[in-house]
Amino acid sequence: MATLLQIGSGVIYSNALRKTLRRPQSSTCIIVTETTPCNKSPTVQRRSANYQPSRWDHHHLLSVENKFAKDKRVRERDLLKEKVRKMLNDEQKTYLDQLEFIDDLQKLGVSYHFEAEIDNILTSSYKKDRTNIQESDLHATALEFRLFRQHGFNVSEDVFDVFMENCGKFDRDDIYGLISLYEASYLSTKLDKNLQIFIRPFATQQLRDFVDTHSNEDFGSCDMVEIVVQALDMPYYWQMRRLSTRWYIDVYGKRQNYKNLVVVEFAKIDFNIVQAIHQEELKNVSSWWMETGLGKQLYFARDRIVENYFWTIGQIQEPQYGYVRQTMTKINALLTTIDDIYDIYGTLEELQLFTVAFENWDINRLDELPEYMRLCFLVIYNEVNSIACEILRTKNINVIPFLKKSWTDVSKAYLVEAKWYKSGHKPNLEEYMQNARISISSPTIFVHFYCVFSDQLSIQVLETLSQHQQNVVRCSSSVFRLANDLVTSPDELARGDVCKSIQCYMSETGASEDKARSHVRQMINDLWDEMNYEKMAHSSSILHHDFMETVINLARMSQCMYQYGDGHGSPEKAKIVDRVMSLLFNPIPLD
């Protein structure tokens, strides 16, 4: 393996870099003049997405410093952590107080410090008789239901039957109960009927009515309207965890009657400390990206190293996983680059050569590629082999066959879409989704993620991931694709691209665009039900529950990135720049 790594360095790398296309004066051109090994004609017409350059300056990134995360703050955080631990284990707390405390710790982003304690509390509670709480309090019942299901416990939706019997007599002023009921409904599985058909629509309508009634009122010191609007905008269970934490810290700090000053101070300091760690990681991957030369040389591709790092925070935010985040940022950036080669720039003949290169995985055949592809393939080759070398060294498993196959699979899926576009083929929705689950790139991401994240690698797991046999991966990939399609398909069709899920459904059924979009949104709901089912059945799965959670987190992250537009292609228009600033560059002020 060392030989493979050595081959992809030195002279070959330098020659590839020098031969790669130079940046033209404008990145919005449609006609590019060049001569390549596969095309002797001096003029090749190519598409352009007109992507804007990165708005993040590398040298500015290197200068970022978090003054709130000094050693003094780390010591202060650790002292507060022990105080919070004592509060969590306080036997004088009522059961509801304990559930609410756990919920606050999770929403404030500090529950990772107390995973063992929280798991013990919930496991013990799950085994006890809980009929008293079920009969008396909607908020308590719904909160318990959500926390149990979030942690993979199999709780029946029947706990809500006692409330449904008097559905018309619900206390509409019980806003806490309604919010808890609404949030609990998003933990439904494909086996549940009442949660989706009755409970969620009812709770949603009550919350909308509450907003309409109180939007111009001062509803107490803690702005309940803001909390309800946030929930309606995106249910907590679907939200990117780190972003939700940043919002909740501010909301929690507004409380007057029931906020815990120790907890909120602990959460603020911890947020800033973790942010400082993330900043250092971002500096490292930004430097790597500059060294590859890809952002400069492949002018037509999205230069999005900061956004690619942002994706990894959504998948796994805890400070101890810095190597995982940095490695996966590199994979994300390389996938973004080849996606744009297939979608925008390459001719069909060139793309076929590129796909063969991934199949062969042979650096000695580099010169068979068009000049602009050589550097890209070489960087991918080097990075993947480097990852495999580290895994062989630390975990004693050769993962090159699995990593290589994941790149071959995604390149073949990209090529299928290029052929569809070239031929004018319009797939039906099922045909489209079978390919799109792979072309969205998440199966490739998950194979690499599993290799660098898991302490103990299983060949059986690698084989099922490589063969696309894990249903939770299929569901997460589908949510990723559909969330992307809902906001990017108009721009992609305008520049010339294959039909997306919305257009496939319209063509297949004759539905209007509005109905097609509604159908896609329902597909996302159904996919979440399937993922929730897989999570509750994790005890019979060969996937470790921690890895399964990162798979689900990618679905959350995709809905964050595409909530208001194409957050990866046009981050400023989609509010992603503001979100990146809040998580990576703006520390929380401390009193």
From Swiss-Prot:
Enzyme Commission no: 4.2.3.105, 4.2.3.106, 4.2.3.15
Required cofactor names: Mg(2+); Mn(2+)
Keywords: Chloroplast, Lyase, Magnesium, Manganese, Metal-binding, Plastid, Transit peptide
Location of the transit peptide in the chain: 1-45
Tissue: Predominantly expressed in flowers but also in leaves, siliques and in stems.
Binding-site positions, Mg(2+) 3: N484, T488, E492
CDD domains to which the protein is assigned, alphabetical: Terpene_cyclase_plant_C1 (cd00684)
Residue span of motif DDXXD motif: 339-343
Binding sites annotated in the UniProt record for (2E)-geranyl diphosphate: R302, D339, D343, R481, N484
GO cellular component: chloroplast stroma
SUPFAM superfamilies: Terpenoid cyclases/Protein prenyltransferases (SSF48239), Terpenoid synthases (SSF48576)
Record field: transmembrane: none
Cofactor note: Binds 3 Mg(2+) or Mn(2+) ions per subunit.
Pathway(s) annotated for this protein in UniProt: Secondary metabolite biosynthesis; terpenoid biosynthesis
Cystine bridges: none
Binding residues annotated for Mg(2+) 1, in chain numbering: D339, D343
Induction: By methyl jasmonate. Also induced in response to the caterpillar P.xylostella or P.rapae feeding.
Recorded catalytic activity of this chain's protein: (2E)-geranyl diphosphate = beta-myrcene + diphosphate; (2E)-geranyl diphosphate = tricyclene + diphosphate; (2E)-geranyl diphosphate = (E)-beta-ocimene + diphosphate
Protein name (Swiss-Prot/TrEMBL): Tricyclene synthase, chloroplastic
Gene: TPS10
